Amino acid sequence: MWSGRFRQPLDPEFEKWQRSFPYDQRLLPFELAASRAHANALEHAGVLSSEELSEIVKALGDIGRRAESSPEFLNDPEAEDVHHFVEKQLAALIGATGYKLHTGRSRNEQIATDLRLFVRESIDTLQNLIADWIEAILARAETAGDSASVLPLAMPAYTHLQPAEPVLAAHWLLAYVEMFLRDASRLADCRKRVNLCPLGSGAVAGATLTLNRQAMAAELGFDAPTANSMDATSDRDFAIEFVDALSLLALHLSRWAEEMILFSTCLLYTSRCV
């Protein structure tokens, strides 16, 4: 794709190395959604006719359905990245009309938008899982000590793997509720900064067309458009912030798993090993 300045073909190994589609194909649903929003904005701006918009939207839907039903459809050795893949498939389905979709749009804003949509969906999925996990812990805490419960009413609390003080089993469980509530809070706070729409930012200095950024943001469920095009297309701090929140969540899950292992050993509960 970027070979116009080269005087000889790229080395096959380099060409394979610089392809990101085997990795970023997971962004395809978000690329298609963002492309639909951009197509609607182009039609509103008078760049696309209503017939062309219908063609593009239908073709984007066809691409998504085929990708879901036939995973081998994504095994395209010629696709450089997810943007190139969609552009190539559009051209195959509707010809020159497919290329018009890229009018007034840059790959810089495309990947920034795709990543924000991906991170936002990941946050929402995790929030639901954390809520279910907290609910399960609370249910166990309420029944600790009951005859049907595997948990005793009281248990030793340990410091440095030595019995320190007696505590209610529910107290130990509720400690994890606090940890996971903080994890959920961090993810919710991160989501506020994720949920801004870069579409309309162009490569770096904004779009040359009059595109309705508010409408594109609303269509994709964003709170608002991003405020600065240079920032929107060049910064990925939201992704780092998300990974940081994940690292703390993973730490708490690891702590839980470690304690489950310890509490299952003869070292801590000899009565269960008799």
Regions found by a protein language model. Give the residues of each.
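Short amphipathic alpha-helical interaction segments
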Residues: 31, 234, 245-248
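A helix-coil-helix interface module used to build multimeric assemblies
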Residues: 1-197, 203-206, 211-217
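Active-site-adjacent "gating/activation" loops or surface patches in catalytic cores
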Residues: 213-236
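Fold-independent oxyanion-binding glycine-rich loops
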Residues: 202, 207, 232-233, 266
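A conserved active-site cap/scaffold subdomain adjacent to cofactor or substrate pockets
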Residues: 239-261, 265
